[in-house]
Each structure stands twice: as structure tokens, then as C-alpha cells.
């Protein structure tokens, strides 16, 4: 144990299937916090595919959470924490109030706002009934979260200081919130067994890599437009590697069609979803990495992981002025910052590709920054201190 203090145990309800690949759940609560005497009982959906329809599975998960909440008590847990489930948070509020147990809420994304935006967007391929259902659910979730759950919580954990400001607009005091940004699991990403790998069809071409979600919300067509500009400026040998997948086939179909219309089918490759080690190997084999985060109310409050992984690997990288990654790039000095326009992305890519040795020297400082500020070891120690303070206040 990293500390000799008494152990504290937290009951946390999460929407993810367990075991989960999400490092902010798996690493923080499964590996790091126990080293500081903070133990967590995680309640999530089954990791395999259970029998029955979706409604039956959702009801089964709800009943599992309800049973755990009803069985919980102050002798066993110092608090209950609900992650990203506003409607279940209402139930937890009632039960915790009855039992005199502190309730925490963890917000990793603005899910209610996202559903409202998607329902109103003409870009979303939704039928009329599904669009109405999504809008109604989003509004209901928004009301439950900001009117019923968060005001009753002892503490709220958010992804960024920008998200804290967003939540504060709805009446939650900022001193009642703690920002826990995304981090990097350095033990995994720096595994010596992960060796740089290049696609066989691009053995010598300069490769720009992107690692992450390919959802339409990410507006990755800007990268295809960037690639088109690079080719127009005499960089016909530059290739674009998209490491990841979309939520549905329409996301990747859209990107492939954009590339086809621009005559870039052979200059772009989508890997689909890959295990972490395989994805990092391809990333390490690229020449530069890029992290475009569209600006807007939803993603401006996010804490992107991809840029942090680029820095941990010492990759020459480009990131746009999304608040969290702009802060990271300015503080680390390890990459280039620009606005999210195809022209500026292309200009920064040329700047790096024309002087890769200097870019690699600058990028090497990224790992030190991650170790000091954004490793899960550091974030976990800070989070453990917050939990101990909260446990002391509620004792």
C-alpha cells in the first residue's frame, strides 16, 4: 500500500460493460486508487452479450443497480458514486438521502446535451420517431441531471475546468466540483514490446496518423481536406492513417466517400477498431500525429486522450485550439497548435515534415509533461486526496 491510512470503500455505478477498456475507470479505480487505500466496488453492465432484447437488458441492469443501492450502508461504503447515468442518479439520490449516505456524480461527457443536439441535427441519419424519442430522452435526462441529481450531490467530478464552468451555470457551486481530466496509462503505452509498425503499402511515404473515434461528430473530413491541400502543394506522397472506427458503418462510409471524391482513396487508410497495443504500434510507425477536436459546446468541455498519448510516445504532433489540448500544448511545448481549418492543419504538417529531426527533439519533452501532470499515477493520487477529504467531511 502506498499509504498507511485506513481503507475507504466506494460503491460506483457505471454504464460501461465490465470489464471495461476505459482507462479512467479501469486504471484509476482498478489499479491506482487501491494503492492509496481507496477501494471501489464497480457495478456495470455484463461484458458479454446477454440474451434478450435491449429493454430487457436495460431493465436487468437497472434492477442490479437498485439491489446494490438498497443493500449499501455507511458501514460498508463511505459514499455512492454514479457515473453518466442521470436517471439512475435520481434513484440513487432518493436511496442515499434515506440512508444518510453521501452521493457523488461523475460526468465524463455532456450526454444529455449531446442527445438534444443530435436530435436537432440534420446530419444525423435518424428516422422521425427515433429523432423525437432522442429529443425527449435528452430533455428528460437534462432535467433530471441539473434539477434533481447534481443539486443533491455532495460532490461532482467533471472532465475539465471548462466543464465545471458549464455545470456551474446550472447552479452547482464550483467549489463542489473537481476536474479529473483524462490521462495516460504509462505502463501500458511504454511497453517495450510495442514496436513501431508501418503499413506494407506505405513503406517509405510520410504518414500523418490520427488515433481515436471516427464518429461524424468529430468532423474528420477536415483531415481529408488537409490531405488534399498537401497534395495540391506538391506533397503527393503524404498519406493519412486513421486508426479507429465509427459508431456505425455510416461514419466510415462518409469518410471513404469524401476521399474518393477528392481522388485520395489510395492516400487514406482506415484500420477499424484495434487493440491498444496494435493501435499504438501503428501510431509509432507514423511520422507525425494529429488531434483535431471540433470547437463547440459539447467538445469544448472534453478532455481528449489522443493528444496525451501522442506526447507520451514522443510523436511530433499537431492539435487545434480545443481548450484542454491547447492548455496541454502550451504547457508542454511539445507540439504545434493551430485552428481547426484544413489550410492551417496543412501548413503545420508541412512545418513538421520539412524538419522532422527538430520536431522529434521538441516532441521528446512531451513524456516528461505527461509523467508530471497527466499520468494516471499522478491523477489517481490527486483524486485519492479528494476522496479522503470528502470522507472526512462526511464522517
Question: How would you label these PLM feature ranges?
Answer:
Residues 20, 218, 277-281, 289-308, ...:
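Nucleotide-sugar-dependent
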Residues 66-70, 94-98, 109-112, 126-156:
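Membrane-proximal helix-turn-helix segments that form the acceptor-binding/catalytic region
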Residues 70-88, 99-105:
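Short N-terminal targeting/anchoring amphipathic segment
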Residues 162, 183:
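Carbohydrate-associated surface elements
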Residues 200-227, 241:
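Conserved donor-binding/catalytic core segment of Leloir-type glycosyltransferases
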Residues 243-244, 252-281:
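Nucleotide-activated donor-binding/catalytic signature segment of Leloir-type glycosyltransferases, i.e.
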Residues 331-343, 351-357:
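Conserved acidic donor-binding segment of nucleotide-sugar-dependent glycosyltransferases
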Residues 351, 358-373, 384-385:
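A short, well-ordered alpha-helix in the C-terminal region of glycosyltransferases
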